[in-house]
């Protein structure tokens, strides 16, 4: 009896350590098939690295739903007509399509979208860090190096902006930690 309960409790713990996700589907504002992604309903985290990477059943955030026909990441619910015109130019550009077809990490592409749209780097620098997590172990040496060097440059730029604008001291320290971690 005791052994049976012990086995059930071990399996119960194992099952409870899994991330609970559900597929989501949203309309692709740039046309084509619906964008598909996953939403996290709950997960177990056993720790956090200096770079903010969580360890446990689900180790990184899910990217926004991705349009399967063009690689656009539907990063918000509604877009104005002028935003869609601007996004269409970038998403269908050779630069973006090349990134998508060469399987650049979704968070790297998302950071590039934000940059193209003129968003402040202080609002999306962390996407570059998340992109490194996709390649943070062998055999991805060259890809990890590429995305890490990109993240380092963005973090340096972010520090410069934060210093000159006297933004949040906590965020300023956080960016320094991220830079040291990479």
Ranges and model annotations:
Residues 2-12:
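Bacterial N-terminal signal peptides
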Residues 15-92:
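N-terminal cysteine/histidine-rich coordination modules
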Residues 88-89, 93, 101-142, 170-182:
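Amphipathic alpha-helical repeat scaffolds of TPR domains
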